[in-house]
């Protein structure tokens, strides 16, 4: 027993000593474009922390007018102040947006449209993960309501401004977790059977299907859409699960930093000549394979229609 303990301790010690090299190996792709975007207007949800914050920082550095759309305005202002100081770009603004409340989403969109005549990049970055069963203000299961329906409604409300500003892009953060996802139309709200991990996977699959269908419907408008897997990133998204927080801390030396996790979002927002790949899924700044469920045209169309029904909107 003592021998096994010593062996395990030695193995973990070696693992942690080599962590910097391992982390560098798994760091993934880097957004290499030098494109500058002065005068461009960007909205990023959940940009008060994590990947979204680093995405906002880089886009501000490149000259964009960046809107941090987040639930916690105080954290948003703190992030914005840091980004403004770091980039010397004063055009980093914070607006209240709670994706678990359709009234908040509509209020954000109404204010933004009154303030801005252009919108060139919309990055649907915010998300929740591994939440105990709960519902949004409007009665939707939290993962499905925030990660999918909230961004679906926001995109719908801002779409005309994107079209008017074309060429424009929509970037939806998905995840490799879509591989465990399944759109269970008979139980979208998870009332019959619920597992937080699968609920997250279902919502990430919904993000991919939404991106696919959105790209199809936007053909010829000058607006393109992309889905992104940022990688396994050390961020606050695990805050709803004690077990995940513990595991994330334990294995944090091997995960991507938030800056590394932002690279694929930046690639899809900035890289030139991506238009032919609208609707596709990217990881480490290159196109990646998706599950057969994520390629199902009928499921994508049905999810679109059901989402419209649940939100009470007409989106042809």
UniProtKB/Swiss-Prot annotation:
Expressed in the inner segments of the photoreceptor in retina. Keywords: Lipid metabolism, NADP, Oxidoreductase, Sensory transduction, Vision. SUPFAM superfamilies: NAD(P)-binding Rossmann-fold domains. The active site is at residue 200. One of its GO terms (biological process) is visual perception. Disruption phenotype: Deficient mice are fertile and developed normally. Deficient mice exhibit normal retinal function at 6 weeks, but they show increased susceptibility to retinal cell apoptosis of both cone and rod photoreceptors induced by high intensity illumination. All- trans-retinol production in inner and outer segments of the photoreceptor is not affected in deficient mice. GO terms for molecular function: 11-cis-retinol dehydrogenase activity; all-trans-retinol dehydrogenase (NAD+) activity; all-trans-retinol dehydrogenase (NADP+) activity. It catalyses: all-trans-retinol + NADP(+) = all-trans-retinal + NADPH + H(+); 11-cis-retinol + NADP(+) = 11-cis-retinal + NADPH + H(+); 9-cis-retinol + NADP(+) = 9-cis-retinal + NADPH + H(+); a 4-hydroxynonen-1-ol + NADP(+) = a 4-hydroxynonenal + NADPH + H(+). NADP(+) binds at residues 46-52. Pathway: Cofactor metabolism; retinol metabolism. The keyword Iron-sulfur does not apply. Its EC number is 1.1.1.300. InterPro entries: NAD(P)-bd_dom_sf, SDR_fam. GO terms for cellular component: photoreceptor inner segment. Substrate binds at residue 175. Belongs to the short-chain dehydrogenases/reductases (SDR) family. Retinoids dehydrogenase/reductase with a clear preference for NADP. Displays high activity towards 9-cis, 11-cis and all-trans-retinal. Shows very weak activity toward 13-cis-retinol. Also exhibits activity, albeit with lower affinity than for retinaldehydes, towards lipid peroxidation products (C9 aldehydes) such as 4-hydroxynonenal and trans-2-nonenal. Plays an important function in photoreceptor cells to detoxify 4-hydroxynonenal and potentially other toxic aldehyde products resulting from lipid peroxidation. Has no dehydrogenase activity towards steroids. Shows clear specificity for the pro-S hydrogen on C4 of NADPH and the pro-R hydrogen on C15 of retinols. This is Retinol dehydrogenase 12. It comes from Mus musculus. The lineage of its organism: Eukaryota, Metazoa, Chordata, Craniata, Vertebrata.
């Amino acid at each position: 027993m003592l021998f096994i303990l010593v062996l395990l301790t030695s193995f973990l010690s070696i693992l942690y000593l080599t962590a910097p090299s391992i982390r560098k190996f798994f760091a993934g792709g880097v957004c290499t474009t030098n494109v500058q975007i002065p005068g461009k207007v960007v909205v990023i949800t959940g940009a008060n922390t994590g990947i979204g914050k680093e995405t906002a920082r880089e886009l501000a550095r490149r000259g964009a007018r960046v809107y941090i759309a987040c639930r916690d305005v105080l954290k948003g202002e703190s992030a914005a102040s840091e980004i403004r100081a770091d980039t010397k770009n004063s055009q980093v603004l914070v607006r209240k947006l709670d994706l678990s409340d359709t009234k908040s989403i509509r209020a954000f969109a109404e204010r933004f449209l009154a303030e801005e005549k252009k919108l060139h990049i919309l990055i649907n970055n915010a998300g929740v993960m591994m939440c105990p069963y709960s519902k949004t203000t409007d009665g939707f299961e939290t993962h499905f309501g925030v990660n999918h329906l909230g961004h679906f409604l926001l995109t719908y409300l801002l779409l005309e401004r994107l079209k008017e500003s074309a060429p424009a892009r929509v970037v939806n953060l998905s995840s490799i977790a879509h591989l465990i996802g399944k759109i269970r139309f008979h139980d979208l709200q998870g009332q019959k059977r619920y597992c937080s991990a699968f609920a997250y996977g279902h919502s990430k699959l919904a993000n991919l299907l939404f991106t696919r269908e959105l790209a199809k419907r936007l053909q010829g408008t000058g607006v393109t859409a992309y889905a992104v897997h940022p990688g396994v990133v050390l961020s606050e998204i695990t805050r709803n699960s004690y077990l995940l927080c513990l595991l994330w801390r334990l294995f944090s030396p091997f995960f991507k930093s938030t800056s590394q996790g932002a690279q694929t979002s930046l690639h899809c927002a900035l890289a030139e000549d991506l238009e032919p790949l609208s609707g596709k899924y990217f990881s480490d700044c290159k196109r990646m394979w998706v599950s057969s469920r994520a390629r199902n045209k009928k499921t994508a169309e049905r999810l679109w229609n059901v989402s419209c029904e649940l939100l009470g909107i007409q989106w042809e």
